[in-house]
């Protein structure tokens, strides 16, 4: 199962935090809230993520493009192409992250529609990229499959 994470909104209610970065990149414990959501989903076996970006998309792209260098020791031979070697492994090494710019003003349904081309016909879940909730994804998936429905919506208080 893949996860589409909606990470393109303006975050107007958190203006002091989101004036300079998108809301999913606001840090909690030294990591972006988006990372915490992905980490939580990975505990349920979800390791393929499509991050549907918009507002300040470049910051999310830069975060994942530079993820290995930020989280590992490495050796680089300057002046040689393809000479970068990372020395440490981390729990996220098996994650696959697709960052898809889905438009600056695109609404939720439009973001899902634009990200759908990366799903390859697989079942998927959609989650907001700026809020972490205590949801038992295994139980949710089981309930969804048992009901044989097209869509299951989960809300939390």
Residue ranges and their predicted role:
Residues 59-157:
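Conserved beta-loop-beta/alpha segment of the NTase-like Rossmann-fold superfamily
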Residues 1-67, 99:
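N-terminal glycine-rich phosphate-binding loop and ensuing alpha1 helix
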């Amino acid at each position: 199962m893949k996860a589409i994470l909606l990470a393109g909104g303006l975050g107007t209610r958190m203006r002091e935090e989101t004036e300079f970065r998108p809301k999913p990149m606001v840090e909690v414990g030294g990591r972006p809230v988006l990372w915490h959501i992905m980490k939580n989903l990975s505990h349920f076996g979800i390791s393929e993520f499509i991050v549907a970006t918009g507002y300040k998309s470049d910051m999310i792209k830069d975060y994942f493009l530079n993820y290995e260098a930020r989280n590992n020791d490495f050796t680089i031979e300057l002046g040689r192409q393809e000479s970068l070697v990372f020395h440490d492994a981390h729990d996220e090494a098996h994650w696959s992250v697709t960052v898809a710019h889905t438009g600056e003003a695109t609404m939720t349904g439009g973001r899902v529609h634009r990200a759908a081309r990366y799903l390859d016909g697989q079942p998927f879940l959609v989650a907001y990229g700026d809020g972490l909730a205590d949801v038992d994804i295994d139980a949710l998936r089981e309930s969804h499959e048992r009901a044989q429905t097209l869509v299951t919506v989960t809300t939390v208080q």
